[in-house]
Amino acid sequence: MERSASKGPPKEKASLARQKPYLCSMSTRVKNQAEILSKLGIAQLNPMQLAAQQVLASSKELVLLSPTGTGKTLGFLLPLVLALDTACDEIQLVIIVPSRELAIQIEQVMREMGTGFKVNAVYGGRSGSKDRIEIKHRPAVLIGTPGRVADHLRREAFDTTFIQTVVLDEFDKSLEIGFESEMRDILHLLPQVRTKILTSATQGVTIPSFVGLKSPQVLDFLEDKISQLHIKKVPSPTKDKLDTLVQLLSHLGAQNGIIFCNFKDSIERVSDYLNEHNLSHGIFSGGMEQIDRERALIKFRNGTYPLLLATDLAARGIDVPELNFIIHYHLPLRAEEFIHRNGRTARMNSQGTAYVLQYEKEALPDFVGQLPVETLKRAPLPAPSPWSTLFVSGGRKDKISKGDVAGLFFKQGMLAKEDLGIIELKTDCAFVGVKTAALEQLLPKVTNQKLKEKKVRVTLV
């Protein structure tokens, strides 16, 4: 039976698509789950993820509240992906996120799950034509920011008949930054939706009525990690606190962390001061081009940058490694952002410390409370990071894998295993962490070499 472009898929197939995901046997699901967790390098799910899985096995409405960094993405994505219909060639699951970074992060998680289902992320900051080219071959899972997804739906860019599940990830953040009308439109334009999942890392959030939840199951894990976080204050004799910041970084030594500022101008001033002291760092703020923000996060994840200087854009919804600390160079104006910033460290079961830089004549807001004082020890400046980042001009669309990139560096490049760091594979390129000391001998051996059928350039980022 042929499909009419105007009328959508035939009713028989739509009915099958609505039923088939829920006919999957438990034994098959468990087997697939074990394979996925193995690919992700995860031994077992944490209590929050297990609870989410149990709720989604019997309920169509879930509100999942859990701190940043506790694995919410896998908590909802794993059971939803295991329920996808392998026979359906249209979009089945839509995930709405407040930021480009979170869209890219979730897309990467799903690719690493190795399910065989196609996934695409769409977001502002890149051409709509690129989106249309990518989703012409339909993904099973579409991830995107509210504005971009709403735009594609209004244009009727794809069939919505098979979209039965919508996730509003960090929904309160999307509302906070002004996406309510787009979110309303998305839900209105997806009439087939049966399962709705909302996630947040904020306590006391209000569920918007337009989502249309009837009897949601609420999982609240927001109190689970308070004991893992230490918050301390560091007094500063001067109002600009720059000298105190450098003393604190020297005191902390070679650890990784985020320094939060409230304003882009302050970030520039602090960045200049850190550069004067040869303290390597990346910058992450809303005023930057998307490609620059992505590269800053890549270099932070692979250790090229031990520090990230950021606005509250980095307080949630970005993929960063385990952090030893965060520093409030400026305190946020609201308690919620204070909590989200602190949530970047002491994630899962790890320890972490949030430091508040306080000018001695400055009164701390009530939401901070009484804090113990951290006494700074005199120490030399931290040594520069031993890592650098290389750009490889070939990626997933060229059928290149992480193993191919590693093989190039080990075989042709004669690189020692301990000198190769994190490899991040993108659609059309790859980024590789490499020990700086090995670069001079490595680069001439690996650039202009073939990976699969493509000759790639390898350059220093």
Regions found by a protein language model. Give the residues of each.
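Walker A/P-loop NTP-binding motif
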Residues: Q54-S58, L74-C88, R111
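Conserved nucleic-acid-binding Ia/Ib motif block in the N-terminal RecA-like helicase ATPase lobe
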Residues: D89-D151, F162, S280-I283
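Conserved interdomain hinge at the start of the Helicase C-terminal
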Residues: Q228-Y273
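Post-DEXD/H (motif II) to motif III coupling segment of the RecA-like Helicase ATP-binding lobe
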Residues: D159-L222
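Conserved segment of the helicase C-terminal RecA-like domain
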Residues: R344-Q370
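A short beta-strand element within the Helicase C-terminal
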Residues: I318-H330, T353-Y355
